[in-house]
Amino acid sequence: MVFYKYSGSGNDFLIVQSFKKKDFSNLAKQVCHRHEGFGADGLVVVLPSKDYDYEWDFYNSDGSKAGMCGNASRCVGLFAYQHAIAPKEHVFLAGKREISIRIEEPNIIESNLGNYKILDVIPALRCEKFFTNDSVLENIPTFYLIDTGVPHLVGFVKNKEGLNSLNTLELRALRHEFNANINIAFIENKETIFLQTYERGVEDFTLACGTGMAAVFIAARIFYNTPKKAALIPKSNESLELSLKNDGIFYKGAVRYIGMSVLGMRVFENGCF
């Protein structure tokens, strides 16, 4: 079984083709393990589709399934084009969501993440019990719960240095309280936003999270009046361009092909596949 590894903004994924839909949870946990597997933030299983160029099943590194992942959508788009599964412009199915892909340059990929939903506006009082003394989060007056394919909690700090002082235990507590990914961001100017994401399913900070960037972008646009196009810079420091149009959130940036790996017999023997 051959796995192809791609990275989108530091968010890395293993991609494999399958002609049968089955549960890949155990396989995802093993191959995504940083020390005992190939190492990745998630596993993408590319499947045939009657109505689309292809469809996927997406698994986080802990084996949990997710309907959507922004960076993975760009990675799988490039994979599909490079392996003659789909043309430069195509549409695939991610769970119940149609994702359109456009390859602008050899490694610049744009995906349309579709529409978003504001789930809740949460005053800081509802979150205070999770904060430690002198927490950076104490100065965030309001949090925003936004669905961009998966749920994200978004809060904005007043200075960029606050992003380097985030407490993992606080973010983990918020993640379980709201069953969402946690994004803390800083608006440097109207067109540049820095952020860090604590990702559900990875259970740690990740170098980038596409749906998280989309949620931060939407929160900034709606509640802080930023423009319809902005550069978002995650932990990896790779800038991505997000724009809001009538038919959804468009998300553009570089994708890198890292390499290929072949599955060893040990995984088969353990019953993961």
Swiss-Prot record:
Name of the protein this chain belongs to: Diaminopimelate epimerase
Pfam family, one: DAP_epimerase
Residues making up the signal peptide according to the UniProt record: none
Keywords per UniProt: Amino-acid biosynthesis, Cytoplasm, Isomerase, Lysine biosynthesis
Record function comment: Catalyzes the stereoinversion of LL-2,6-diaminopimelate (L,L-DAP) to meso-diaminopimelate (meso-DAP), a precursor of L-lysine and an essential component of the bacterial peptidoglycan.
EC top class, as a word: isomerase
InterPro entries membership: DAP_epimerase_AS, DAP_epimerase_DapF
Family: Belongs to the diaminopimelate epimerase family.
Enzyme active site: C69, C209
Originating species: Helicobacter pylori (strain HPAG1)
Cellular compartments annotated: Cytoplasm
GO cellular component terms attached to this protein's record: cytosol
